[in-house]
């Protein structure tokens, strides 16, 4: 019984932090009028264009919107595995 109460009232915050991050993303999406579907489409287009020049880890690619005050930034974390040779370059 004590273990249950300890878990119930613990200050672990794991699920609290996840819920807070999800709410933040929803609010940012609402403020910018960008739907999650549009963000996924943008992510797919970024993969397509960047893949022309670099070998990237598509599974680890992350794209999000970050809000700071009145500004919103598109933040992309794109792990690069290597560069591709582009026609016409030495």
From Swiss-Prot:
Q: Which UniProt keywords apply?
A: Cell cycle, Cell division
GO biological-process terms attached to the record: cell division; regulation of division septum assembly
Q: Does the keyword Cell inner membrane apply?
A: no
Instruction: Please name the InterPro entries in this protein's record.
Output: MinE, MinE_sf
A Pfam family name for this chain?
MinE
Superkingdom of the organism of origin:
Bacteria
Q: Which family does it belong to?
A: Belongs to the MinE family.
What does this protein do, in the record's words?
A: Prevents the cell division inhibition by proteins MinC and MinD at internal division sites while permitting inhibition at polar sites. This ensures cell division at the proper site by restricting the formation of a division septum at the midpoint of the long axis of the cell.
Q: Which protein are we looking at?
A: Cell division topological specificity factor
Question: What organism is recorded for this protein?
Answer: Pelotomaculum thermopropionicum (strain DSM 13744 / JCM 10971 / SI)
Q: What is the lineage of its organism?
A: Bacteria, Bacillati, Bacillota, Clostridia, Eubacteriales
């Amino acid at each position: 019984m004590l273990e249950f109460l300890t878990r119930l009232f613990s200050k672990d915050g794991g699920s609290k932090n996840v819920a807070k991050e999800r709410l933040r993303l929803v609010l940012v999406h609402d403020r910018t009028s960008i739907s999650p579907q549009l963000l996924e489409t943008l992510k797919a287009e970024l993969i397509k264009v960047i893949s022309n020049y670099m070998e990237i880890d598509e599974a680890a690619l992350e794209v999000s919107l970050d809000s700071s005050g009145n500004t919103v930034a598109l933040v992309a974390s794109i792990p690069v595995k290597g560069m591709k040779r582009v026609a016409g370059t030495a």
